[in-house]
Regions:
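Extracytoplasmic/periplasmic, Sec-exported soluble proteins
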Residues: 14-25, 42, 46, 65, ...
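Solvent-exposed loop/turn segments at secondary-structure junctions
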Residues: 18-22, 47-49, 67-71, 149-150, ...
Length: 192
């Protein structure tokens, strides 16, 4: 199977923090993009420098990671609103503030709100505001799906992998449980 390659595609840099695992992912991305004629260099930064560079938007592509603060999908979604301190992708900020290329239609949810060629604040921020203010669980989850669709359609966020926790547990241990967030609790456990 022939692979078409881009020509005259601008080179880019992938920013990541120091870790053999993060470097390996960067090398994989570099190799995968090279197959399409895209040149990507890798830039490694120490953790604090990396965080500052990312927060200031001083990158083309950067590694990001997130673990939920609490067991609710909004923990992964509200970080991308314009005013969020975790919005390192710079959605709705600075040069992107007036970028009107997003669309949202909430009429199928019974909400009289439809915008085309709108800003991030008029679409994503608005939807997240509704998620945080509604008391109806079904509407709340439907709105979170709308927000997720906006985020994924932007192309700026690309989930690559999820962390997993592998552990061994003796069959003699009773009462230990794990939360969906990956925390292991032993306060009610004992050995048979």
């Amino acid at each position: 199977m022939a692979t078409k390659k881009f020509t005259d595609f601008p080179s880019m840099t992938y920013l990541y923090n120091t870790s053999d695992g993060h470097r390996a992912i960067g090398e994989y991305l570099q190799q995968a993009l090279a197959a399409y004629g895209i040149t990507m260099t890798l830039e490694n930064q120490e953790w604090n420098t990396f965080l500052e560079t990312r927060k200031n938007g001083g990158y083309t592509i950067a590694r990001n990671g997130w673990l939920a603060d609490y067991n609710d999908p909004i923990s992964f979604l509200d970080m991308w609103i314009t005013a969020s301190g975790n919005n390192d992708a710079q959605f709705g900020k600075d040069d992107h503030k007036n970028l009107a290329c997003y669309s949202v239609d909430l009429t199928s949810l019974g909400i009289d709100y439809k915008k085309t060629d709108a800003t991030w604040a008029e679409t994503y921020d608005y939807v997240i505001g509704l998620v945080k203010s509604t008391t109806d669980t079904n509407t709340r989850y439907a709105l979170m799906h709308v927000a997720e669709d906006l985020l994924m359609e932007s192309g700026a966020i690309v989930p690559l992998y999820y962390y997993t926790d592998i552990y061994m547990c003796s069959e003699k241990l009773e009462g230990m449980f794990s939360s969906p967030l990956g925390y292991n609790f032993f306060m009610y456990s004992n050995l048979k």
